[in-house]
Design a protein with these regions (language model features):
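Glycine-rich anion/phosphate-binding loop at the beta-strand->alpha-helix junction
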Residues: 10-104, 109-110
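Alpha/propeptide regions of enzymes that mature by internal proteolysis
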Residues: 1-43, 105-192, 201-207
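Short amphipathic beta-strand/extended segments with alternating polar/hydrophobic composition
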Residues: 68-74, 192-197, 202-204
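Short active-site-adjacent structural elements
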Residues: 91-92, 190-194
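Conserved glycine-rich phosphate/nucleotide-binding loop
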Residues: 55, 61-62, 196-207
Length: 207
C-alpha cells in the first residue's frame, strides 16, 4: 500500500515512508470496521483515516496560524483519508507550505500526495533556510536531498509563486483522479482545489 501510494503520486523522490502514517491509519480504520464500528476517525499525528457508514457528515478541524479551518466531509464522497504535510511536521519537507492538506480515498494516498504537493509548494528566496536531510537525521530515507529548516519573511510574489506551484501539482493529481481535493496554506494565504466540490466544503475559519 505504501509503495503503491508513492508511485501513484508521481513524485519519484519519495520513498514508501512518505505514506507510512497514513497506511497505519488505514489499517486501524479497516480493523475498526471489521469489529462493527459505524463511525471511525483515526488520527495518527495529523494523518487521518475516516469513515461513517450511517450517512452523517464528518467535520475535521485543521489548525493553521492560530486559526482553524473546518472541513465538512460528505459520507458518500469516498473521502476516507485526510492528511497534512508541511513545515513543523514530523517529517521533512522540501517546500514552504505551512500546511499541505490532501483529501483522498485512502489515508495512504492522501499522505503521499500531501508530501508531494507540499514539496512542490516552493520558491527560491533568501528568507528560506535549507540543509541536507542527513545533517538533521543520519538515518533519513532521503539523504542528499535539501529540506526546509525554516521560512522567514517572504514577499507576496514569492508566496503566490509557491502557492501556484503547489496547486498546479494538486490540480494534476485531481485531474488524474488520484486525490479528491487539496487545501494549501502558506503563511496567511489559503487556496483550495477544486474551489467548489460537492464532496466537501471548507466551512468556517475560527479566529
Amino acid at each position: 500500500k505504501m509503495v503503491d501510494a508513492v508511485c501513484r503520486s508521481g513524485d519519484c523522490s519519495l520513498t514508501p515512508l512518505a505514506a507510512v502514517a497514513g497506511s497505519f491509519s488505514d489499517l486501524a480504520l479497516e480493523k475498526s470496521l471489521e469489529f462493527g464500528a459505524e463511525r471511525v476517525i483515526i488520527n495518527n499525528g495529523g494523518d487521518i483515516a475516516l469513515k461513517d457508514i450511517t450517512g452523517n457528515i464528518i467535520k475535521v478541524g485543521i489548525p493553521v496560524n492560530n486559526k482553524e479551518l473546518v472541513l465538512s466531509i460528505d459520507s458518500q464522497s469516498k473521502i476516507n483519508g485526510i492528511c497534512t504535510s508541511g513545515i513543523g511536521g514530523r517529517s521533512f519537507t522540501k517546500g514552504i507550505a505551512t500546511a499541505s492538506v490532501v483529501l483522498g480515498e485512502t489515508a495512504a494516498m492522501a499522505d503521499a500526495c500531501a508530501t508531494c504537493i507540499g514539496n512542490a509548494a516552493d520558491v527560491e528566496s533568501d528568507g528560506i533556510v535549507r540543509c541536507y536531510a542527513e545533517e538533521i537525521d543520519s538515518e533519513t530515507d532521503i539523504p542528499g536531498n535539501l529540506v526546509t529548516l525554516s521560512v522567514g519573511e517572504l514577499s507576496k510574489k514569492e508566496i503566490y509563486r509557491a502557492l501556484l506551484n503547489g496547486i498546479e501539482t494538486a490540480e494534476k493529481l485531481y485531474n488524474e483522479n488520484i486525490i479528491k481535493g487539496s487545501i494549501l496554506c502558506i503563511k496567511d494565504k489559503i487556496v483550495m482545489f477544486p474551489e467548489n466540490s460537492s464532496y466537501f466544503t471548507l466551512e468556517k475559519i475560527y479566529a
